[in-house]
């Protein structure tokens, strides 16, 4: 599968995540038939245009935390968008934003 095809499948899958729910990079990779491509799902999210309709903020890591970015404002933006959807997020002692993954997890 070419990467542009992979990205399209990833974006389509992410658009299926319901409001107020999240999924993980690995779960999206499995859903699109590329189970070892979790990091590439992250890259697909990174390449989205800022004004995209794809709900990128609903994809988190498998530990239930918002992944660190080069620009910390992105983490805050993801946290804010999830909280707007009713997802409860707390900050760990390490400064990570975390949520109760079993409560909010969406699996296709």
Swiss-Prot record:
Involved in DNA damage recognition. Binds DNA containing O(6)-methylguanine and larger O(6)-alkylguanine adducts. The DNA is bent, the damaged base is rotated out of the DNA duplex into a hydrophobic binding pocket (nucleotide flipping), with Arg-39 donating a hydrogen bond to the orphaned cytosine to stabilize the extrahelical DNA conformation. This structural change in DNA presents the lesion to the nucleotide excision repair (NER) pathway. The affinity for O(6)-alkylguanine adducts increases with the size of the alkyl group. Keywords: DNA damage, DNA repair, DNA-binding. It holds the Pfam family DNA_binding_1. Coiled coil: none annotated. Belongs to the MGMT family. ATL subfamily. The record marks 69 as: Critical for recognition of O(6)-alkylguanines, probes the electrostatic potential of the flipped base to distinguish between O(6)-alkylguanine and guanine. Changing residue 69 to A/F: Reduces discrimination of modified bases 10-100-fold and increases sensitivity toward alkylating agents. PANTHER family: 6-O-METHYLGUANINE DNA METHYLTRANSFERASE, ALKYLTRANSFERASE-LIKE PROTEIN 1. One of its GO terms (molecular function) is catalytic activity. Gene3D superfamilies: Winged helix-like DNA-binding domain superfamily/Winged helix DNA-binding domain. It comes from Schizosaccharomyces pombe (strain 972 / ATCC 24843). This is Alkyltransferase-like protein 1. GO terms for biological process: global genome nucleotide-excision repair; transcription-coupled nucleotide-excision repair. The record marks 39 as: Arg finger, required for nucleotide flipping. GO terms for cellular component: cytosol; nucleus. The record marks 25 as: Required for phosphate rotation/nucleotide flipping. Does not have alkyltransferase activity. A tryptophan residue replaces the cysteine at the known active site of MGMT. It comes from the Eukaryota.
């Amino acid at each position: 599968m070419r990467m542009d095809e992979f990205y399209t499948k990833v974006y389509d899958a992410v658009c299926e995540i319901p409001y107020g729910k999240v999924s993980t990079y690995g779960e999206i990779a499995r859903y699109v038939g590329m189970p070892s491509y979790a990091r590439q799902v992250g890259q697909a999210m990174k390449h989205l245009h800022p004004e995209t309709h794809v709900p990128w903020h609903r994809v988190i890591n498998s530990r239930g935390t918002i992944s660190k970015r080069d620009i910390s404002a992105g983490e805050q933006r993801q946290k804010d968008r999830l909280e707007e959807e009713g997802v409860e997020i707390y900050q760990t002692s390490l400064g990570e934003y975390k949520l109760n993954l079993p409560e909010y997890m969406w699996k296709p």
